């Protein structure tokens, strides 16, 4: 339940269009106006995933800090990790504005941003200047006008290898024409071979192997999920992120905004993304790391992702409605839920509802 102060702050921000409000929130984080979250570390939330140790399982999803402007400020809000990007080799302006739409009744967001970002060099410069050593992932993509999109992903691996703790290859945004075609089995095999070969080459030269995750769409057929699982396993991919935004508009109250093109995120994405997460967990088995994202708005929904098969979870859109204190609320809430469950580690609860979610019709 949103408290009166948060409600007032939200009302003020909502006087501005969503993209302007987003820019204001970045500026506030840069200036230090947003207070840091004081969390007591809970060893039950700490776990090692893909060879990396996370202090807690909650991350900020890609899309908020596209240009690596505030990664350390985000970590101070209580996130155990954050993911910058999506970044493309060359700067690009994205699609025409307006391109972000709030669905207030649904607590959802539709965006058709189109990978707007300042390019590799700008983001790299900011990350290289950091001294904190926080858990910061880099989400890489392809330029809209690229003649060789796979080469763009390889370029991302090479450019950010010295500053990334992990990589995410984003092939599932619905806002770059043809990008989701890379999820097809033949294209995916070529992409994974190229990206992982670049990672292995850079790893051999540097002495450190950086994990690579693949971010997939929720709008996959059963065959599509089969293909992605098979290629992920055969290429020894380090993990999956499930899922990106959806093109579906099922069950929305705000039918006026629902007509806008773009990807839907926030609360309306929770059930669909969680069902796809569980189906992918059943396909890839217990060992491949999965980050669950889509509609996480509370400790309860974060834990439900974990019960459905996620090792870690991410959020973004729900912070639009709940404010910057959401991360701390979720992490503290997870500790309370572990108390209730009498669990010694959050890992004990993973997969406990995977069958339920895999069977959900969405």
From Swiss-Prot:
Binds 1 FMN per subunit. It catalyses: (S)-dihydroorotate + a quinone = orotate + a quinol. Its main location: membrane. FMN binds at residues 62-66, 86, 139, 170, 215, 243, 266, 295, 316-317. It is found in: Cell membrane. One of its GO terms (molecular function) is dihydroorotate dehydrogenase (quinone) activity. The active site is at 173 (nucleophile). It holds the Pfam family DHO_dh. Its cofactor is FMN. It is an enzyme of class 1 (oxidoreductase). Substrate binds at residues 66, 111-115, 170, 175, 244-245. Pathway: Pyrimidine metabolism; UMP biosynthesis via de novo pathway; orotate from (S)-dihydroorotate (quinone route): step 1/1. Its EC number is 1.3.5.2. One of its GO terms (cellular component) is plasma membrane. SUPFAM superfamilies: FMN-linked oxidoreductases (SSF51395). It is a peripheral membrane protein. Keywords: Cell membrane, Flavoprotein, FMN, Membrane, Oxidoreductase, Pyrimidine biosynthesis. InterPro entries: Aldolase_TIM, DHO_dehydrogenase, Dihydroorotate_DH_2, Dihydroorotate_DH_cat, Dihydroorotate_DH_CS. GO terms for biological process: 'de novo' pyrimidine nucleobase biosynthetic process; 'de novo' UMP biosynthetic process. Belongs to the dihydroorotate dehydrogenase family. Type 2 subfamily. Catalyzes the conversion of dihydroorotate to orotate with quinone as electron acceptor. Monomer. This is Dihydroorotate dehydrogenase (quinone). It comes from Rhizobium johnstonii (strain DSM 114642 / LMG 32736 / 3841).
């Amino acid at each position: 339940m949103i408290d009166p102060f948060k409600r007032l702050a939200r009302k003020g921000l909502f006087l501005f269009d969503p993209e302007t409000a987003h820019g204001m929130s970045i500026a506030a984080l840069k200036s230090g106006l947003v207070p840091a979250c004081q969390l007591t570390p809970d060893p039950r939330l700490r776990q090692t995933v893909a060879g990396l140790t996370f202090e807690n399982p909650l991350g900020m999803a890609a899309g908020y800090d596209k240009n690596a402007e505030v990664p350390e400020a985000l970590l101070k809000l209580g996130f155990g990790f954050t993911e910058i990007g999506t970044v493309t080799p060359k700067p690009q302006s994205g699609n025409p504005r307006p391109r972000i739409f709030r669905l207030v009744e649904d607590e959802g967001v539709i965006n058709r941003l189109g990978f707007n970002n300042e390019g590799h060099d700008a983001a790299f410069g900011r990350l290289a200047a950091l001294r904190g050593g926080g858990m910061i992932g880099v989400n890489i993509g392809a330029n809209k006008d690229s003649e060789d999109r796979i080469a763009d992903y390889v370029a991302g691996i090479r450019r950010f290898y010295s500053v990334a703790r992990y990589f995410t290859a984003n092939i599932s945004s619905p806002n770059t024409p043809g990008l989701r075609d890379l999820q097809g089995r033949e294209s995916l095999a070529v992409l994974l071979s190229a990206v992982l070969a670049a990672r292995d080459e850079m790893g051999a030269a540097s002495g450190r192997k950086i994990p690579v995750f693949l971010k997939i769409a929720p709008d996959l057929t059963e065959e599509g999920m089969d293909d992605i699982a098979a290629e992920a396993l055969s290429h020894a991919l380090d993990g999956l992120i499930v899922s990106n935004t959806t093109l579906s508009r099922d069950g929305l109250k705000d039918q006026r905004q629902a007509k806008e093109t773009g990807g839907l995120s926030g609360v309306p994405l929770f059930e669909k993304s969680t069902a796809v997460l569980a189906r992918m967990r059943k396909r890839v088995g217990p060992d491949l790391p999965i980050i669950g994202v889509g509609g996480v708005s509370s400790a309860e929904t974060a834990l439900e992702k974990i019960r459905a098969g996620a090792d870690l979870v991410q959020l973004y859109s729900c912070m639009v409605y709940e404010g910057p204190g959401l991360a701390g609320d979720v992490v503290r809430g997870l500790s309370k839920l572990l108390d209730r469950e009498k669990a010694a580690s959050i890992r004990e609860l993973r997969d406990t509802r995977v069958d339920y979610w895999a069977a959900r019709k969405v």
